[in-house]
Every structure is written in C-alpha cells, then in structure tokens.
C-alpha cells in the first residue's frame, strides 16, 4: 500500500495525483490518557465523509469569474496507520485526485468539505508528485465543521509564500474571499463555536451589572484607553447596555475556532484546572479557613503548604465539579470523597536554603534576575522626583537624603555615585500614590507607595541603600500630599532595638515587594504582554493572507493567546475573579492598568530601546547589540539582548527575501491595511502617538516584527514562568500588605520584638488569599509537554521557500548557541547575580530550542515558548 502512495501515480501518468491527508478527530482531544492511541471510528472518514477538490494556480475558469479551475471531488481512501511520523491522535488517509496537469495546471489550493455531523482538525494535505513540480503541501491546521455550518467553501492554499502582487491571478479571488470571511464584518453575532470571525471589541465583559458587580468599560474613550479584545457578539446586560453579558464558568467564551487549542496541549488541562480552582477548590479553601484560625503564625506554618499539605474538608461542590469535568487529569485534581489534600511543590527560591530569600543580596538580585526585572532604572537626579501633577499632588519629591545613603556608597558622595552610573532606583511611588486613598479604604489593605535606592558595588552586585514608604494625605484644600518615612538596612543579630530594627527592615522590603508583585502582574505581565498582543493577532488574521510572508513569520507567536485571554476575562481578571481576590488593588486593578496603558509605547517594547529608556544601557555602535549595559551582570538584559539580536537577525534575513526594497513594502496593500488597522483600531485609543512606525521602510517592518515576536515569546517567558519559582513562597513576594509599619513605642512594635515572624506573616497576604494565589501561580508557571519553543515550528512544512527554511535553521542554531552561553554564565563565579544566595540559576530566557522531547515540561523555570501560553 505504501509503495503505491509513495510511487504516487497509477494508470495515466498525467491524469491522477496521489497524496495523503492528516487529521485529528474531535474526540482525540478529549481522551483520558494523552498517551493513548485512538483507532476507533476511523471508518467514518472513508467514502464520502470528507471530500477534497484541487484548485488550479495557473489555469482559470472563465465561467467561474476567472478563478482557478476546480477539479472533481476526491474522497479519502486507505487509513495509513503505520507511518511513524504520526503523533498521538493523528490519523492519515490516502487520497487520489483526477487531475491532468496539461489541462488543469499546477494545483495551488484545495477545497475541503466535511459531510459528517462532527468537526475534525485538518493538519496537512500532501500531493506526492505533481508532474513538472514535485510535491505540493497544503498546510491547514484548522478545524473543519460540517459543510452546513459555513456560508462558504473551506479553502486552503499550498505552502508557497506570496505577496498580494505575486499571488497567481487564478488564486487571488480565493485569497480575497478568505480574508473577507475571516473579517466577518457583516456578522454581528453572538458567534457560535464553529465561527471564524475576527472582530474587535472593548473590555466591557469584566463586570456583572445585573448582579450589582459592575466594572468600568476599558477602551473606546480618552479616560479609559485600552487595547482591543476579540469580539464575541454576546448580548448586553439588562441594566447596562454598554456592558456585555457574561457566561457561566463551564461555558467557553467565543474565540475564532482555530485560536482555540487544536493540539494535544496541557493548556486544555490547565484551562480546566483554573476553572476547577475557581469553582471548587476556592470554596473548599474558604471552608477550611473558616474552620481554622485562618492565619499563618510563622514561616514554618507556610512551609507546611509544601512539606505536608493542607487537608481541606470535603464539600459537595467538589464532587459535583468532578462529575462535570471531562478530562481524567482534572478528575485527579478533585479526588472523590474524603479530604482534599492540597500540597504544593517546593518553590525554587527556597529549595536549597529556606532563609536566603531574606538577605539583602537576594532582594537586590531578584530586581535584576527575578520575575519582574524590567522596572529598575538608573538614578539621574537626587533625591528622586515625582512626576505627578503638583496642582493635585503637591511636591512629592523623595525625602531620602544623602545622610540616609552615603554610608553604603563605598566612600563616594551621592553626586560621585550618580556621575559614575552607580545609583539605581525601583520607583513605584508614582505608580500607586494616586490610587492609595481608594485602595487603603478596602478591608484588610494597608499599602504604601515605595521607592528603593540601590548601589552598584565593585563586585557587580546591587546593595539596597534605602527604602521610602509613603502614604497619601488628603489636605483640607483637596491637595493629596505624601507622608513618607525612610528606612535603611539593619544588621542581623544582637538583642533589643537592634534585633527589632532588622525585622523592621525585612518588613520594609516586604512592602516594596507588595508593590512590585502588583506591578508585575498587572502591568509587566497582563498589560504589556497578554493585552497588547491581542490586537496584533486579530489584525493579522483580518488583513494578511495565510500566504503572506508576514503572516507566516508571526503566526507561531500568536498560538493560544486569544484563548488564554478569553479564559482570563472569564476567571482571572473579571470582577470578583482570582486577580481581584489575591492582589491589593482589587476592584480598581484593571482600571489602573488602563491609566498605565496611556503611557505604553510599542517603540519602547524593543529590548534595547527599553534598556536605554530606563538608563541601564547606553547606545554603543561598537557593541555587538548596539547598546552597552551599565550593569554588566544583569541576567535578564544579558540573556535578553542575545535573544533579541537573534530574533532581529531572523526577521531581517526572512523579510529581505520578499522585500528587496522599500517600494515593494509600500506597494503591499495587505501589509499597509494590516498596520493601519493595528494602529487605528486594535490600539486605536493611542493611534495619535508620535512613536508609531509609519511602515514605509523595510527597516521599520523588521523592527516591528521583531518587537511582536519578542513580546509574545521572550518578554512573556521572562515574566510568566518564574512566577511560582519566585513568588510561590509567600514571604518572598507577598501580594498584599494589611498592617502599617510598627512604630517604636507602640504595642505593635513590642509585638514585633516578641514574635517577629508572626507580625511579618500577619502583615502580608492572609491565608485564604495566599493559598488561592499560590495555587494559581503553580498552574500558570508550568510549561506544557508539547510546548513549541522559539526557533521551533509545530509544522515543518510551514513554507515551501528554501531560503526561508535556511534562515530559520540559522535562527535555531543561534538560539542553541545562546543556551550554551546561559549555562556557561550561570557557572561563572564572577557573575554573582546569575545564581545568588538562593542558589537558583537564572534560566527564564534559556531558549530551550534544542529540547525536542518536552524535557522542560512542568515547573522547570526555563524555556522561551513561541507565544503567550500558560
């Protein structure tokens, strides 16, 4: 049988084309055991179940609008079971086409019809040997629903790459039709599961006004600008016509069907896991907390989460939930009957040493090599100044003085340290001060706005010099001023006041980390990766054909993003969702992120530009990456610049194949429509910003594509996969502070002297919030077993262009070299920021391109997936 397929031709050599089709049945994604091979039900695809028609790329049919000639329908034949290239759940079939090349030309597209009652996932169709041309591959990677669900034919192009002007005339109408279908501008919704419509909407589905839990609409107004999300077309709420109605937890929010996981991916499981957490485990935790004192008393109490687990009481909701979830893996999350044992893995930051996180060295190291290493900036004026409007906030210049810091400057004056590029700041003061009156009026909240000054020592490490904690003060005249206190490092040891002051300093660092945790989750992570990326996904599908070179370049970096963002709107960032439950701004959180989006700049997302803007690097044409780091041992920047450079080289080489000059780019109608829509619609609330590239030069396109790839891959990896390893241990990165700093002469200060650990853990995130938040971080921080990493593609036949394939191979080789470089730097004892007191090496930007077996699955804290995937 295989010989006949591979030989490819029988009978009249020019009248028949043989090939094969690879698909996955719907229930292949619902199997209980991901390792199982599903072989039942294959026969349903044989006969007339699935039909295919070839479309000519070279000869037109004058009776069909001069479209490419369409061949007769061909049905699937043999089920080819023995080919080792098939992965779990895939089925491969033979197919024979009646097609005479002399009369019909070279096939360039194929029409596929599903005559079943259920959908299937079509991966590829391959023609083995087209006379005079060789093999032709059609890459689909698309769900095919029954033909009755569509108003149009499902058409797939060969894997040739074509600018609109180079598309064969016979195929151009099909290309235009496909984009029109995906835009769906004439379809208002509500969209159904099978729909493929990519349209925009504002964030108006986070609240539930009908239940008395509204949230402001984000996007579409100067006051609350926001990136757009994918439209669902759901009906408005009854009480607020501007708000979209919400779905129950077990219903899936609409995203275009091919954006929903079409692969055997842990993300399906993770999606269910999050829903299980929200709907079942959270109530169980709440019940547990109600039945116990509900507080941690010591670090030892917190360690029990990892060493022994917590026995949660059995509640009926858990058993009901267990029945409703399909996957066995999720059923295992929710055991039947008895107590539910919640046991979490030991976070990396305390695996080697349970106390090293408390050192100033580790606190400072995580600013450069932690989960939020993109906030630190060089201090250029002393004391630090606020940029808040003085008409509303008065003068909020920092109260840190030279006397506070000079003992830690290794003999230098403040000015000498500034002139030597040795003073740095993590400045969250302006980020939070405008919101603290509202935030601190919420129960169990006592949040400071913080500034942290750091000194770059001779050995390349940072030392914290001072922490300023500020609270807002509303004056009679309406002015909101700051009341600030400055804290400086205290040595451990001793008795009496000295011992207490060391704990005061530990609390000061905790208040800083509370600020940083929120900024990381809300801005560095959600806004600056997830939210800003979705408009690019939508615009690419609406305006760039799958045959367009830029579509082929960017597609891997969009995988799962819309689905994950929809899941976030449903369970994480919605009103009353896990984010509001566990992070201090609570109901104000997403509205705050809208205010910060006003200052977001696409141009600043390119890593070299970001580093220069923060003053931690300076332009340097002689440096390999055109910038020179002022903090030489800055793991995020060291690894990030190498990865950025590899991405930029790849984009440069790839795009040069299709755009030999700026004129070709300017004449590319699809590309120009794409960029116009990104700017004017997807990010329309900031369309007038002067930093937007005009997209008139190939250099602008290279930079834009490199930036999009960077955001979806490396930037997201840097802020996502270290969440549990660093913040899974609550005291290291708490999400809330509940009490003010104890002052000398108060009973709170005396309590700190008596039982400092108890005061510390009672000051930070309470037990209920902590367990829920940490449980979520564990889910979000895992790599899936079938992760596709930077420098890999899930479909080897993604293009027929040999030059593009060679450039991609070089890209992968560069990334593999970076892996070796990261390993070597982590072993270099002179690079003290790479590993630090916790003995936890920085590998978040280790590309993992060389891993073809899924070795980095789970909580590995290493690897850069192509896209924003949990």
From Swiss-Prot:
<dbReference type="GO" id="GO:1990136">
    <property type="term" value="F:linoleate 9S-lipoxygenase activity"/>
</dbReference>
<keyword id="KW-0444">Lipid biosynthesis</keyword>
<dbReference type="InterPro" id="IPR042057">
    <property type="entry name" value="Lipoxy_PLAT/LH2"/>
</dbReference>
<dbReference type="InterPro" id="IPR036226">
    <property type="entry name" value="LipOase_C_sf"/>
</dbReference>
<feature type="domain" description="PLAT">
    <location>
        <begin position="32"/>
        <end position="158"/>
    </location>
</feature>
<dbReference type="GO" id="GO:0031408">
    <property type="term" value="P:oxylipin biosynthetic process"/>
</dbReference>
<keyword id="KW-0223">Dioxygenase</keyword>
<dbReference type="InterPro" id="IPR020834">
    <property type="entry name" value="LipOase_CS"/>
</dbReference>
<feature type="region of interest" description="Disordered">
    <location>
        <begin position="203"/>
        <end position="243"/>
    </location>
</feature>
<keyword id="KW-0408">Iron</keyword>
<feature type="binding site">
    <location>
        <position position="525"/>
    </location>
    <ligand>
        <name>Fe cation</name>
    </ligand>
</feature>
<dbReference type="InterPro" id="IPR027433">
    <property type="entry name" value="Lipoxygenase_dom_3"/>
</dbReference>
<comment type="pathway">
    <text>Lipid metabolism; oxylipin biosynthesis.</text>
</comment>
<dbReference type="InterPro" id="IPR001246">
    <property type="entry name" value="LipOase_plant"/>
</dbReference>
<dbReference type="InterPro" id="IPR000907">
    <property type="entry name" value="LipOase"/>
</dbReference>
<dbReference type="InterPro" id="IPR013819">
    <property type="entry name" value="LipOase_C"/>
</dbReference>
<comment type="function">
    <text>Plant lipoxygenase may be involved in a number of diverse aspects of plant physiology including growth and development, pest resistance, and senescence or responses to wounding. Catalyzes the hydroperoxidation of lipids containing a cis,cis-1,4-pentadiene structure.</text>
</comment>
<keyword id="KW-0276">Fatty acid metabolism</keyword>
<dbReference type="InterPro" id="IPR001024">
    <property type="entry name" value="PLAT/LH2_dom"/>
</dbReference>
<keyword id="KW-0443">Lipid metabolism</keyword>
<dbReference type="GO" id="GO:0006633">
    <property type="term" value="P:fatty acid biosynthetic process"/>
</dbReference>
<keyword id="KW-0963">Cytoplasm</keyword>
<comment type="similarity">
    <text>Belongs to the lipoxygenase family.</text>
</comment>
<feature type="binding site">
    <location>
        <position position="870"/>
    </location>
    <ligand>
        <name>Fe cation</name>
    </ligand>
</feature>
<dbReference type="InterPro" id="IPR020833">
    <property type="entry name" value="LipOase_Fe_BS"/>
</dbReference>
<feature type="binding site">
    <location>
        <position position="530"/>
    </location>
    <ligand>
        <name>Fe cation</name>
    </ligand>
</feature>
<dbReference type="GO" id="GO:0016165">
    <property type="term" value="F:linoleate 13S-lipoxygenase activity"/>
</dbReference>
<dbReference type="Pfam" id="PF00305">
    <property type="entry name" value="Lipoxygenase"/>
</dbReference>
<keyword id="KW-0479">Metal-binding</keyword>
<protein>
    <recommendedName>
        <fullName>Linoleate 9S-lipoxygenase 2</fullName>
        <ecNumber>1.13.11.58</ecNumber>
    </recommendedName>
</protein>
<dbReference type="InterPro" id="IPR036392">
    <property type="entry name" value="PLAT/LH2_dom_sf"/>
</dbReference>
<dbReference type="GO" id="GO:0009611">
    <property type="term" value="P:response to wounding"/>
</dbReference>
<comment type="subunit">
    <text>Monomer.</text>
</comment>
<feature type="binding site">
    <location>
        <position position="716"/>
    </location>
    <ligand>
        <name>Fe cation</name>
    </ligand>
</feature>
<feature type="domain" description="Lipoxygenase">
    <location>
        <begin position="161"/>
        <end position="870"/>
    </location>
</feature>
<dbReference type="GO" id="GO:0046872">
    <property type="term" value="F:metal ion binding"/>
</dbReference>
<dbReference type="GO" id="GO:0034440">
    <property type="term" value="P:lipid oxidation"/>
</dbReference>
<dbReference type="GO" id="GO:0016702">
    <property type="term" value="F:oxidoreductase activity, acting on single donors with incorporation of molecular oxygen, incorporation of two atoms of oxygen"/>
</dbReference>
<keyword id="KW-0560">Oxidoreductase</keyword>
<feature type="binding site">
    <location>
        <position position="720"/>
    </location>
    <ligand>
        <name>Fe cation</name>
    </ligand>
</feature>
<dbReference type="GO" id="GO:0051707">
    <property type="term" value="P:response to other organism"/>
</dbReference>
<keyword id="KW-0925">Oxylipin biosynthesis</keyword>
